[in-house]
Amino acid sequence: MSRVSRAGVLAAYRDGVTVICELAAQFSDAAWLAVTPCSEWRAADLAGHLRCVADDYHEYLDDAPASRLARLLATNVSADSLARKLARQNAAELAALPDVPGPEHIAAFAESARAYGRRLPPSWDLLHHTYRGSEVTVGAMAGAACAEWHLHAWDLARSLGKDYRPADPELVLAAWQGGTPQLWAGLPVEPGRDDPWYVLLLASGRDPAWVQL
């Protein structure tokens, strides 16, 4: 975690938003219907999910440290149970979105995500939530958001038949670890795998070998 600086996380956060927009611009109308590594979502669904998540981050910051996410994590819910609850939340939020094309969702995501990024510096050291005795600050949660953008950039790239890797995967991994302590307790390390991007893809439930067929 010593590698993670405020400036580094904020720069990587902005890069994640930018690369999502760059990748989204490469999708044709037909390509938005393609499957993604997020097996339940096509590319257009993933665009909608990004829009929802960016808005959720605003809500969590508005209500910190008593947001609905903070209240859930304060119950010390297991990682598996948390994943199921968030999956249901994601599905409900996606279903409630207007039926618009993928580019419109991406534009809304970019506006919301960049606005969230501008809100982070003044609140950096404030408490965002607590999980099993670990206090997660707004800055640490920014690291989790940063990693989420880069992970979803990889999802979009793979849906296009391409690959993606952040410029500083070690920083992105460390940032995500700081913001998601619920995911790392007891996580086994695969022998011989010291690539931080590979580790993050696996830890986030992705198959690094996934390809668009």
Give the ranges of each region predicted by the language model:
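Structured surface interface patches that mediate subunit assembly and partner/cofactor docking
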Residues: 1-11, 16, 26, 30-35, ...
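Hydrophobic pocket/interface hotspot
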Residues: 20, 46, 152
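Conserved alpha-helical segments that form or flank metal/cofactor-binding pockets of metalloenzymes
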Residues: 43-88
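Short amphipathic alpha-helical/adjacent loop interface patches that line ligand
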Residues: 17, 50, 54, 113
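A short small-residue
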Residues: 89-97
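Short alpha-helical hairpin
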Residues: 25-29, 84-89
